Amino acid sequence: MPKHGKRYRALEGKVDRNKQYSIDEAAALVKELATAKFDETVEVHFRLGIDPRKSDQNVRGTVALPHGTGRSVRVAVITKGENVQAAEAAGADVVGSDELIERIAGGFMDFDAVVATPDMMAQIGQKLARLLGPRGLLPNPKSGTVGADVAGMVRGLKAGRIEFRNDKTGVVHAPIGKASFESGNLSANYQALISALEGAKPGTAKGVFLRSAYLTTTMGPSIPLALGGAALA
């Protein structure tokens, strides 16, 4: 493992490893630790008390962050008929049906999210599943990207709705904003995420569900969080 440079070590020295920070404390500190020359993304990492090898214990859901993510989301919509106009009016970046499917199959990937109406899913599954699936872009009802309300799906993604799911180690990684956000807005986004995560707890998961949590930025050290809300020294 490569060693961290002086800058990183200096920032890490500002984090008390014997303390669990309240989200308000951590949100203020994470802004101080974001010293890169770009607006770093602020992320939270939750270790869950699940067995990710068991499909009935996997966690997946969506949440609308009240203050958005701070990034511009390019949305592609695969639909036809009157839904095309509805998607365009809602701000979709690219809209189409069969021709868009063929375009994506040919290598077009200038988007961050894909939504679709149910009538297009058979073709999408046949032609795009292997391409979009590994990238986490395949439309799915569970992630709120398949449905009849294309305008609502587009607006939700543009406004800051994110999808969360555990990885193969039972950890959920999710963005909650940018380092330029007010600390109170980061805290509010965190609270929305943790509420959604708790609501997605599988019925088969036993014991403590939220094992640990850390707040971090793109280039900064992680900050341990107190899951009970108050700081723990």
From Swiss-Prot:
Quaternary data: Part of the 50S ribosomal subunit.
Domain of life according to the entry: Bacteria
Family, as annotated: Belongs to the universal ribosomal protein uL1 family.
Gene Ontology terms describing biological process: regulation of translation; translation
Tagged with keyword Ribosomal protein: yes
HAMAP family, per database record: Ribosomal_uL1_B (MF_01318_B)
InterPro entries cross-referenced by the UniProt entry: Ribosom_uL1_bac-type (IPR005878), Ribosomal_uL1 (IPR002143), Ribosomal_uL1-like (IPR023674), Ribosomal_uL1/biogenesis (IPR028364), Ribosomal_uL1_3-a/b-sand (IPR016095), Ribosomal_uL1_CS (IPR023673)
Record has Repressor as a keyword: yes
GO CC annotation, single: large ribosomal subunit
Job of this protein: Binds directly to 23S rRNA. Forms the L1 stalk. Unlike the case in the Thermus thermophilus 70S ribosome, this protein is not seen to block the exit path of the E site tRNA. It is clear that the protein in the structure is flexible however, so this is probably due to its position in these crystals.
Keywords, alphabetical: Repressor, Ribonucleoprotein, Ribosomal protein, RNA-binding, rRNA-binding, Translation regulation, tRNA-binding
GO molecular function: rRNA binding; structural constituent of ribosome; tRNA binding
CDD domains: Ribosomal_L1 (cd00403)
Protein name stated in the entry: Large ribosomal subunit protein uL1
